[in-house]
Amino acid sequence: MHPSYQKLLSYVSEIKHLNHSSAAAVVVMQNDQIILEHYEGVHGNEHSNLIGIDSMFNIASARKSYLALAIGYALYEKKIHSLDDCVSKYLKNYDQQIFQGTTIRHLMTHSHGLDERDDGSIYREFAAGESWAYRGINIRIITELFKYLYDYDFTQLLKERVFMPLGFKSTEWSTEESEALVKVIDYPEQKATFQLYPYDDGMGSNLHTTAREFALWGNLHLNMGRHEGIQVVPEDVIRLCTSIQSLQYDDGRLPANGLFWYVQEKAKERSEIGECVPKGSYQILGNTGPLLLVVPENHLVVVRMYNKRYNYGGKNYLHYLREFSNRASDAFTIPSCSKMHRL
């Protein structure tokens, strides 16, 4: 094994240990081929199966990239006129005063300014488009929007139009425990469970996939919707999802987003992408540790999987996310950035 590959895997193992994850996996594709694959650990914090190619991880918020593709279809098929349509044009069941000026673009780029209290009431943190904050309420609204537009769940569209043509066998919204599912650890001393959310939350939660199929999901985007020479997803849908759709912020520290994906424009302090990763790259993350990095400049897809809720580093977790993508950049012959470009 190339020394730089081993160095990256050692780093993945180190963070796995520090964060009390029981499992880790790495799959790297370049030029449509797997060039590195690594599995270690077990499915939970009690006696359980060894991690392997069939192990299905709960990817938590990384499922946003799947919802993003569904909304990309809605735009492509003119179900939505524009990203700049106000949400109130489609959904009437929310307080119109609070939602005033909130567009689909704001919801898809985390610039909507909405949040939710423990009692379920919605309030506004800042005016739509004026800042950026990662909150969960936009996922529920966008999920509702898709169902309003198509009269069925976005998961059905993905299964029929994407998963089946790709031949996916191990990507599913799981509702029952099985030996293939990697359990999520909240606390090392507590029993782990395969689910993060209630079955009926309506947001396509508890999406499980293997490291290989997660990498193929990234590779589909890298190839602009093509898989083994066949155009599975329209190129325009992929372009919508993975190009910058966020507005310019007064605060230069805030990240750029496509449709939920973080997109590398230039190094941003509050972005999860490392400053050494080339422009045009994009990444998605879940709080159980899955990370999918796509680097078009080097025709590269990098997947890292864990099974511990909350990413290592506490309030400084972004540092470790950037550190991983920077190390991946160094390992797979992406030119390193100079000190002048570092944060």
Residue ranges of model-derived segments:
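Short, conserved catalytic-motif segment at the N-terminal edge
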Residues: 2-57
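Active-site helix/loop module of the DD-peptidase/beta-lactamase fold
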Residues: 7, 53, 58-61, 76-115, ...
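Active-site SXXK
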Residues: 12, 26, 32, 55-83, ...
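Flexible glycine/proline-enriched surface loops and loop-helix/loop-strand junctions
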Residues: 51-54, 123-128, 138-140, 195-203
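Active-site-proximal alpha-helical segments within enzyme catalytic domains
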Residues: 141-145, 205-227, 290-306
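Active-site-proximal binding-pocket segments
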Residues: 174, 179-183, 191-231, 241
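Active-site Gly/Thr loop motif
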Residues: 182-205, 243-301
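Structured C-terminal helix/loop/strand segments within mature extracytoplasmic catalytic/sensor domains
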Residues: 281-343
